[in-house]
Design a protein with these regions (language model features):
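ATP-binding N-terminal substructure of ATP-dependent carboxylate-amine bond-forming enzymes
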Residues: 1-105
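Phosphate-binding site of ATP-dependent enzymes
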Residues: 168-226, 232-245, 249, 263-266
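Peripheral (often C-terminal) accessory segments that flank ATP-dependent C-N-forming ligase machineries
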Residues: 289-341
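Active-site nucleotide/adenylate-binding loops and adjacent lid/helix of ATP-dependent enzymes
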Residues: 112-187, 194, 206-209, 238-239
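Glycine-rich phosphate/pyrophosphate-binding beta-alpha loops
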Residues: 220-223, 228-230, 270-283
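Flexible, glycine/charged-enriched surface loops at secondary-structure junctions
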Residues: 188-189, 254-260, 301-305
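Conserved metal-phosphate-binding beta-hairpin within the catalytic cores
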Residues: 248-281
Length: 341
């Protein structure tokens, strides 16, 4: 039986990955760095997890790459599925080394860095004719509201709620700009686009071919002013899939990514496992299994799409979102809970 190693078991997305890989016939091993958690992650108790392995220290340690590589060497060329961004970047920075002991689909570090830079993505999208929000470079906005954000909020360790802020007036703009300049001397300032958030999740093979695609529309998010999905619904949009693919392909990307839109406008790219990744499991998508098969050199059908209308609700986040919505006096409609953690 082929082995798959799922890293960073503390994240909720690891549960979806473990279930999908187990169902695809893999022996699934979950890892977690001791210093990054206070207790054994819940995924370790899953019947789909064949074994749980601690890694000493933290994922941010300089020695993490050595410890992860040593663990991988104890298995016969496993598939490596990186859930955490730090682990992904660690492997991306030493792809040749890790490729000697494991199979994976991970883009080179410079490609990941470029896709994490919102201004680089904005400029590339414009060159490809993909709609983007109007951006104000070094000049005060002509109209409000505007969104102010650093080039890469994760780089500064910011939580989702702190990675951007909305200014409705010139006074608020000046205050927020000064705050964001603590992280980025030249924050990005764009028109705020209204409407539901849309995610286009793609899996690209080593040759850049599109293997799998899944679209989702946000129903709930937390924070309610803008944050990760807590409840979403799958749907199909060929035009958005094409735009997302052309953008990723132009960077020479390989692996998994979620391209975020509002309406027709492209906002940003998450070139890694994203917050609403459990939707791939709720939608019964072969996303994770196709990743493992393609990483191991198997030929997968190209351009696999999935039926619309599947719901994914993450109970804890949905409860927080509903409570905030109700407390703010907005119309309250409880979201369904259809995906259990």
């Amino acid at each position: 039986m082929k082995t798959a190693i799922v890293t960073d078991g503390k994240y909720r997305s690891s549960i979806a990955a473990v279930r999908a890989l187990h169902r695809a016939g893999y022996q699934v091993i979950v890892t977690q760095t001791r210093a990054d958690v206070h207790a054994v992650p819940a995924v370790a108790a899953s019947r789909c997890c064949a074994a749980f392995r601690w890694i000493d220290g933290a994922a941010a340690d300089d020695s993490y790459a050595d410890r992860l590589a040593a663990l991988l060497e104890t298995y016969d060329r496993p598939v490596l599925f990186c859930v955490g961004a730090v682990t992904l970047n660690t492997v991306a920075a030493q792809r040749e080394r890790f490729a000697r002991v494991a199979d994976f689909l991970i883009a080179p570090r410079p490609v990941l860095d470029a896709l994490n830079d919102k201004e680089t993505v904005h400029a590339r999208a414009q060159s490809l004719g993909i709609p983007v929000p109007r951006q104000y470079d070094g000049v005060p906005p002509e109209r409000y509201p505007v969104v102010i954000k650093p080039h890469c909020g994760e780089k500064f360790g910011l939580k989702a709620a702190d990675r951007y802020a909305v200014a409705d007036t010139p006074e608020a703009y000046a205050q927020i700009l000064a705050r964001m300049q603590r992280y980025d001397p030249a924050p990005i300032v764009q028109d705020r686009i209204t409407g539901p958030g849309i995610g286009v999740s793609l899996l690209l093979g080593r040759d850049g071919c599109l293997i799998c695609a899944l679209c989702h529309r946000r129903i709930r998010e937390y924070p309610v002013t803008g944050g990760p999905s807590t409840c979403c619904e799958s749907f199909y949009d060929a035009a958005l899939i094409d735009r997302a693919y052309r953008l990723l392909h132009s960077f020479g990307f390989t692996g998994m990514a979620m391209v975020e839109f509002k309406g027709d406008c492209l906002l940003e790219v998450n070139p890694r496992v994203w917050g609403s990744f459990p939707m791939t499991e709720a939608a019964q998508s072969p996303f994770t299994a196709d990743y493992a098969r393609a990483a191991g050199g198997m030929v997968c059908p190209h351009g696999r799409l999935h039926p619309p209308g599947r719901l994914c609700s993450l109970p804890h986040g949905t409860a927080l979102s509903d409570a905030k919505t109700y407390g703010a006096g907005r119309r309250f409609r409880p979201a369904p809970c259809v995906y259990g953690i």
